[in-house]
Amino acid sequence: MSENIKQGGAGTFMQAPQDSVPLPPKDAEVMTTACDYCTVACGYKVYRWPVGKEGGMKAKDNAFNADFPHQQIFGAWASPAQHNIVNHNGRSHHVLVLPDRDTTVVNPGGNHSIRGGTLAQKCYNPSNRTSERLLYPMIRVRGTLMPVSWDLATEVMADISQYILAKYGEHAWAMKTYSYQYFENTYAITKLGMTSIGTPAFAWHDKASATNDATGLDDAGVNSFASSDQDWADCEVAFLSGVDPYETKTTLFTQWMMPGDKKFIFVTPHRTMGVAWAESTGRGMWLPIIPGTDTVLHLALARIIVENGWQDQAFIDKWVANKWEVDSGYGRGTRNTGWQWRTTWGKWQSDWKDYSAWILKQKEGELETAAKITGLRAEDIRKAAEWIAKPKADGTRVKASFMLEKGNYWTNNYMNSASLASLGLICGSGNRPGQMISRGGGHQRGGMSAGGGSGWLSPEKYPGRRKKSFNLDRWMMNGNVRFAWVIGTTWTAAMMASQALQDKMFSLTRGNPHQISSLDRKAIFETLKQRVDSGGTVIANSDIYPCVPVGTEYADIVLPAATWGEDNFTRCNSERRLRLYSKFYDAPGEAKPDWWIIAKFAQKMGYDKDGSYQWKNSNDVFEEAARFGRNGVLNYHPLVVKAKEKGVKGHELLRTYGTDGIQTPIRMKDGELVGTQRLHDPANDWDEVEGQEVKRKWLYAFGTHSGKAILLKTPWDYPGWSQFYKAALPRKEKGEVWVTNGRVNETWQSGFDDLRKPYLSQRWPYPMLIMHPDEAKPRGIESGDFVQVYNDTVYIQMGEPQGVKEDDLYFDTLMKNGHIKTTDGQFVAVAIVSEEMRPGVVMANFNYPQAPANSVVHAVPDPMTNNYRYKLGRGVLTKVGESPYKHSFTSMTLKPRDIV
């Protein structure tokens, strides 16, 4: 146990607070940026000035133009967590990273979360734990990473890559990478992987395949990020499925949703802070649902609405496709693409006449049956239906908006998201102010694909031999990957059956007898050649910190990446708002941005012979990438065109927009750039689009051939779900409970930054496990105890099953045909016993490196989407000792989170 504490950076300690912060002088440089963490991306200003110089206490002597001390709590002010000392042009400089009090969007007045309030602490400073940053390219020699030059590192990668591509083909060369860390980087990464190499073995950080998250929304014709912040302010009821925006999108909640008198319906097994606040004000309802059963709740709500005639019939008549419109635009070709065959398959395809009759026949939609399946009270389900759909006394309709996030679609991927879309549509939501259907968002929207890609080369097929995305986890587990480049992601901890994936990765890399023993380039190649020819794998890992375990244990080549603040980058937030994230300090050591690393490798591969990969700076990548986004909702191409007209760089034109930025897709009107507040809104049916852009139907209608939304049926007894769900249920005879996972407000993702920030690492030095007293007391567990979560039957889908018949990818058939194997998994966390969790469900930290909760989750994807059910773990809880936090008050509070 002590070793686990050591690895987690844990222990009881008291952070000695810094008692003063220097004021910026009048001539301090000021730059704009946005928060690096959640999808809201609050706007920030960076003040930079040389060490040895400070501003004065009088307004005339500091850059804040404010007298100090002052009593204005929301006035000019900086905390110790917002200050750091960095290098700029080789000299030490003070920096203050402060929320922009002058911005008019996203976070007006300088609102921000605790995550953004500690941004300055993520900047490299050799005097604190950011000194753990990767500083130099390294190659593992006899198990130890040794610093080398960029040339040698990329030459070694190119040597073995060329050999693998020639002998084993592009399928054997894989990329596992983030999808969000700035347009400049994701464009370069996809250009290399999808175009130059053309590998189908490509997957994003959060999925085993290059798939979409909320496929049910896509099929309905609803873009996952159609809404704006203003829509969440303007709605009268917010139906929040699998999400508490306060915990994960804090400023969206506090700035845009809390003001006024709107009502909140939270569908989540965890009574989080946002839930507690809404209930305490009389404006909220908590539906503590059993994980995975959201579809049944949606069916029950829809049935109540239809039975009472509360549907928005005028909206349905105008905006929901009839059966002929669903099929329109397909021609005579095969229904090979996922959304084509799903929306035209009778099991799901519907229109209002069919759906309204179907919903009344669903046994699971009957109120008492639904209450039993979901674990909710029947009266609460009825009350929720009234809130979202019952007309007001004067006959006007409630303005309801529907938000979903991972608690929804990562338990029952297709059916939960599709059924929510149908529920929202019959309530008249989806394309008008205050009445939207949208994801809340996790990370920011920084993906810009270079096109190409060979995902259709996947050896797997959906039933009917239809195209299916490539599952990289399964490809690795089957031993088919000879080279993998892992970029900015905790691959194993983020995926299902984490420990089984770790074991396999170890056996293919460090467990292989062929290990590098010197830094001679030819000798390295011969060694790695012998490894791949013996069935082993070579791994390169690009990251900002040593990544456990891929970078620290398995990777042969480790590359140091530059990140936020260390180069000029761009991306959008959840309302598609594009901003420049300004460079304001030097990257440490020899760390380079990922676009630069990609270009360096591509040149070693010879992919630059046609003039490609010759970028001199990040702006070059930004401008090249612009034309590849013209068909999408993140289109910023008009901005680049406008910049060229003005004779300035695209980055520099965007810089003039400051923290307000501009919402994509961008268009031209009267020669000026204009943003798009929301998608699908008929008010967007502008006149002829100026310049080089083409009017896209999804701007002013839904994203279907007809422009009308598709109403989808979601039968609870669909075998592709019901067979798996039956197998995944906690087994009472073993004393198992549901094991889900989630985020808490204070930390972000895997804690890559937060574990190195003094205050936050004191607050969360070790992963927690929140459980109800009903689970804790019989097991002798108290808050502060170390608890092991163990699942002795974790299912893993193996092989590349071919879908010919309809049931070929159903769980029972996969099991019968030998495509399901079982393993076990466990992790240890610190118990927090609280009634904030519903009985029968425990919640662990999302993606904590030393305690991968996904180890107890099944690696069997949804047969409709090829996505995992990330939050449907199960396990036995066992007390294994007391943590040092149980009797200490210096770190890791064990108090409930639902205190208001």
Swiss-Prot record:
Record-annotated site: Involved in charge transfer: 113
Record EC number: 1.-.-.-
Gene Ontology biological-process entries: respiratory electron transport chain
Region described as Disordered: spans on this chain: 1-21
Binding-site residues for [3Fe-4S] cluster, renumbered to this chain: 35, 38, 42
Name used for this protein in its record: Iodate reductase subunit IdrA
Keywords in alphabetical order: 3Fe-4S, Iron, Iron-sulfur, Metal-binding, Molybdenum, Oxidoreductase, Periplasm
GO molecular function, one term: 3 iron, 4 sulfur cluster binding
A GO CC term attached to the entry: oxidoreductase complex
Keyword Metal-binding: yes
Broadest EC class assigned to this enzyme: oxidoreductase
Family: Belongs to the prokaryotic molybdopterin-containing oxidoreductase family.
Cofactor: [3Fe-4S] cluster; Mo-bis(molybdopterin guanine dinucleotide)
Naturally occurring in which organism (per UniProt): Denitromonas iodatirespirans
Keyword Nucleotide-binding found: no
Cell compartments where the protein resides: Periplasm
Function: Involved in iodate respiration. May accept electrons from cytochrome c551, and catalyze the reduction of iodate (IO(3)(-)) to produce the chemically unstable intermediate hypoiodous acid (HIO). This intermediate then undergoes abiotic disproportionation to yield two molecules of iodide (I(-)) and one molecule of iodate. The resultant iodate subsequently cycles back into the reductive pathway. The initial reduction of iodate may inadvertently produce low levels of incidental toxic H(2)O(2), which is detoxified by IdrP1 and IdrP2.
Family annotation (SUPFAM superfamilies): ADC-like, Formate dehydrogenase/DMSO reductase, domains 1-3
Subunit structure: The iodate reductase (Idr) complex is composed of a molybdopterin-dependent iodate reductase (IdrA and IdrB subunits) and two associated peroxidases (IdrP1 and IdrP2).
Disruption phenotype: Deletion mutant is incapable of growth via iodate respiration, while growth under oxic conditions remains unimpaired.
Cofactor note: Binds 1 [3Fe-4S] cluster per subunit. Binds 1 molybdenum-bis(molybdopterin guanine dinucleotide) (Mo-bis-MGD) cofactor per subunit.
